């Protein structure tokens, strides 16, 4: 799935769109996305000058966006009219810094999906090395007016 297809699903736009491509998909079960991290990312201006490091919370956000795509594709037409909202982040661990030039491989796997709540395990890798992991919960709700 390319960026144009991703933008039809996710409401996020620059500078907060954190997924460039979906490379593997089992709707409702598992999804793998890529994020190419470049020095042009606006967050590098302040995190940190002279030593740019991608903020860990944005890596977790990238996981949430990949999970959102997976959940959307597994949902019915009525749910697809809604927007997904974060509910919880548990057991987040930041194991390796992510730098400009890195490519994040973001893997999410469903733990459960019940009563409109999705729980997923997310992992982000750089060159096959685990950089970040977390468990995320989200739900779909009506768009704010």
UniProtKB/Swiss-Prot annotation:
Subcellular location, principal: cytoplasm
GO MF: (3R)-hydroxyacyl-[acyl-carrier-protein] dehydratase activity
EC number: 4.2.1.59
Pfam families membership: FabA
Reaction equations catalysed: a (3R)-hydroxyacyl-[ACP] = a (2E)-enoyl-[ACP] + H2O
Signal peptide: none
Cellular component terms per the entry's GO annotation: cytoplasm; membrane
CDD domains named in the record: FabZ
Active site residues according to the UniProt entry: 47
Superkingdom of the organism of origin: Bacteria
Assigned keywords, A-Z: Cytoplasm, Lipid A biosynthesis, Lipid biosynthesis, Lipid metabolism, Lyase
GO annotation terms (biological process): fatty acid biosynthetic process; lipid A biosynthetic process
Subcellular location: Cytoplasm
Stated role: Involved in unsaturated fatty acids biosynthesis. Catalyzes the dehydration of short chain beta-hydroxyacyl-ACPs and long chain saturated and unsaturated beta-hydroxyacyl-ACPs.
Family: Belongs to the thioester dehydratase family. FabZ subfamily.
Protein's name according to its UniProt entry: 3-hydroxyacyl-[acyl-carrier-protein] dehydratase FabZ
Protein source organism: Geotalea uraniireducens (strain Rf4) (Geobacter uraniireducens)
Lineage, top ranks: Bacteria, Pseudomonadati, Thermodesulfobacteriota, Desulfuromonadia, Geobacterales
Gene: fabZ
